[in-house]
UniProtKB/Swiss-Prot annotation:
EC number: 1.5.1.5, 3.5.4.9
Gene designation: folD
Lipoprotein keyword on record: no
Pfam families in the cross-refs: THF_DHG_CYH, THF_DHG_CYH_C
Annotated residues for binding of NADP(+): 165-167, 190, 231
Subunit structure: Homodimer.
Pathway terms, separated by semicolons: One-carbon metabolism; tetrahydrofolate interconversion
Protein name (database record): Bifunctional protein FolD
This protein's UniProt keywords: Amino-acid biosynthesis, Histidine biosynthesis, Hydrolase, Methionine biosynthesis, Multifunctional enzyme, NADP, One-carbon metabolism, Oxidoreductase, Purine biosynthesis
Family annotation (InterPro entries): Aminoacid_DH-like_N_sf, NAD(P)-bd_dom_sf, THF_DH/CycHdrlase, THF_DH/CycHdrlase_cat_dom, THF_DH/CycHdrlase_CS, THF_DH/CycHdrlase_NAD-bd_dom
Transmembrane region(s): none
NADP recorded as keyword: yes
A GO term for molecular function: methenyltetrahydrofolate cyclohydrolase activity
Species, as recorded: Janthinobacterium sp. (strain Marseille)
Length: 283
C-alpha cells in the first residue's frame, strides 16, 4: 500500500476561491474584510510568514494592514496599537506574529485583542468557546488539519485519533476539534510512556511535536490517516516534518507532505476566520 498524498496546496486553492467570493460580496456592501498583522522585531522566519499572510489577503480580496516595529518596542506601545486596531472599523481581524521579544508578555498581548477580532483563536475566551462547543474562532492550524482530514471523505465518528503534542496552539485545540467530530481521542506528549503503543491503535494520527521522526512507519497502523504539522530541517537543511514521510507513506492510507500539507492550510483558515469576523460584524 502506498498512501494517497493529501495536497494542502490544492485544497487551500479551492477554499480560497470561496474566500474570494465571500470577500467580494462583503466589499460590494462597503464592508471589505480587513486583517491587521503586527510584526515586532526582525525574526527571519516571522518575516516570511507575515509576507505570505499579507499576500494571501491581497490575492483574495481582503484589505491587509502590515505594521512592522523594532524589537525594542515597549509592551505598552504594542498594547496601545492593539487598542487602536480594536476600535478601527476597517479591521476585522488582528494577528500579532509570534514569537515576540522576551520583554513583551505574549499572553497579555493576546488577551488585549478584541474577542471579535481574535482570528488566530489564541485567547482564553476563544479556547473556552472551543472547549464548551460555542461558536467562535478555531486556531488556524488545527482548523486546517480538520479540513485536510475531511477532504479524504473519512467520517471521524467512532474512529480512534491520536494527537502527539499538547501545545495550546495545536495539540490541545486539535484534540477538541476531533472530539467535536465524535472521534475517540488520545493525547500523547513527552511524558507518554509508550508512544508507539498508542499510535499503532490509531485510525488518525496528528503529529505536532516539532521533532523529526517522532512518528516512524512501524508506529503506524496500516491504513491510518497521518497529518504532519511539524516544520523541521533534515541533516541537509531540507524542510521536513515530524513524520518519517518516505517510509510512513508505505503504511498509511492518506498522508500530508512537508512542505505542501498543513502549512498552506494554516494561512487559508486565517483568511476564513477573518471573513467570518467580517460577516458577523456586517450581520
Amino acid at each position: 500500500m502506498t498512501a494517497q498524498i493529501i495536497d494542502g496546496n490544492l485544497l487551500s486553492q479551492q477554499l480560497r476561491k470561496d474566500v474570494a467570493v465571500r470577500a467580494a460580496a462583503l466589499t460590494a456592501k462597503g464592508k471589505q474584510p480587513g486583517l491587521a498583522v503586527i510584526l515586532v522585531g526582525a525574526d527571519p522566519a516571522s518575516q516570511v510568514y507575515v509576507r505570505n499572510k499579507v499576500k494571501a489577503c491581497e490575492d483574495n480580496g481582503l484589505y491587509s494592514l502590515l505594521e512592522k516595529y523594532d524589537a525594542d518596542m515597549t509592551e505598552a506601545a504594542l498594547l496601545a496599537r492593539i487598542a487602536a486596531l480594536n476600535a478601527d472599523p476597517k479591521i476585522h481581524g488582528i494577528l500579532v506574529q509570534m514569537p515576540l521579544p522576551k520583554h513583551i508578555d505574549s499572553n497579555k498581548v493576546i488577551e488585549a485583542i478584541s474577542p471579535r477580532k481574535d482570528v488566530d483563536g489564541y485567547s482564553v475566551l476563544s479556547a473556552g468557546e472551543l472547549l464548551t462547543g460555542l461558536p467562535g474562532f478555531r486556531p488556524c492550524t488545527p482548523y486546517g488539519c480538520m479540513k485536510l482530514i475531511e477532504s479524504t471523505g473519512t467520517k471521524l465518528a467512532g474512529k480512534h485519533a491520536v494527537v502527539i503534542g499538547r501545545s495550546n496552539t495545536v495539540g490541545k485545540p486539535m484534540a477538541l476539534l476531533l472530539l467535536q467530530a465524535n472521534a475517540t481521542v488520545t493525547i500523547c506528549h513527552s511524558g507518554t510512556a509508550d508512544l508507539a503503543y498508542h499510535t499503532r491503535q490509531a485510525d488518525v494520527v496528528v503529529a505536532a511535536t516539532g521533532r523529526r521522526n517522532t512518528l516512524t512507519a512501524e508506529m503506524i497502523k496500516p491504513g491510518a490517516i497521518v497529518i504532519d504539522v511539524g516544520i523541521n530541517r533534515d541533516d541537509n537543511g531540507k524542510l521536513c516534518g515530524d513524520v518519517d514521510f518516505a517510509n510512513a507513506k508505505e503504511v498509511a492510507s492518506y498522508i500530508t507532505p512537508v512542505p505542501g500539507g498543513v502549512g498552506p492550510m494554516t494561512i487559508t483558515m486565517l483568511l476564513v476566520n477573518t471573513i467570518e469576523a467580517a460577516e458577523r460584524e456586517t450581520n
